[in-house]
Amino acid sequence: MFQNYNQCTFCKSKKILKLNNEKAENNFYVEAFLSDLRINKKKFSKIKVYECKNCGIKLNNPWFTKSISRKIYSIIYGQHNNSWNNLIKFIENKKFPDHGDLFELLKKNIKIKKYAEYNSPFMGLFLNFFDDEYNKSLSFYKNIHKNLIDYFNSRQLAGKSNLVKKLSNKKSIIYNNNIYKAKKTNLKKKFLQKFLFVDNTSLGWGQNDNYKSVNSKSYAQELFDLNLLEFDDENKKYKFDLFGIFHSLDHTFEPRKILNFALDSSKYVVIYCHNQERGISKQHQFSFTRKFLGFLHNNKIYNIDITKKINKSYKNSELYFLCSKNKKNIDLISRKFK
């Protein structure tokens, strides 16, 4: 069930130091692990917090095997409820994910024509861009949401009779036409191309990230008109003005590969993550700290900490930063974010 992680998940350094005074409090994720995996608290307490002395991230070690990790993020908590809640709040109340003034600042200071994100599609800025492209109408949002859910469900025909299949097919056509007409009627202007890069990580939500039997990535692809692509060398040809990674860089066992992919393909990368200076919650194998920004800079990944520049009230310790492999890009944006 557990395995040792004796090197840093990000930089692969073996210079990791146990932090004896750091403990993580239980949360609803942890309570679910203990219950569903039938782990006693004594065994669970063997998980200790380590810090990488090279890049500054924190790690839980030992931690779950990759097989158990996949079970956690596909079965025990297969639904990314925070992500889906962001969508539901937007549809019902036109409330955006709380990123302070980030969207307005980025749009003002970066000419964005091609934009991409990694994995969780409702954690970042896709909802903001969608709202910019269409008439700001709650009735439109609710209408298209209902028709999307009905459309996806009408295509789920396993175990149905031939008559039900025939009727469902007719309904599917109606729902699909409703979606098309609603978008066409309410569209103001398509001003950018949007991409979502996905992978099959065992440390993040994917195959079972569903709401009302609809997968988040499928829903997002239709709602936002996304180009949905896999992380692979073939897709390095795509270039972006901005790449967003929102609470997902600590949900992959290959964070450096993901970050480098984003940096190599985009002028700017914006990252939103936990800032776990005082411990690390046990649903994470690793997490970032502000020390990580110094490591990036020393490795010519230039960055600016914008945590205090986006007018956000924080309930927890979090970190926002912009980065680029082009120093001129960061120097330019740093002057604009003062």
Please give the residue ranges for each predicted region:
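Conserved N-terminal segment of class I S-adenosyl-L-methionine
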Residues: M1-L242, F246, K257-L259, R290, ...
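S-adenosyl-L-methionine-dependent methyltransferase catalytic module, highlighting the catalytic core
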Residues: F2-Y5, N54, I245-H247, T252-K338
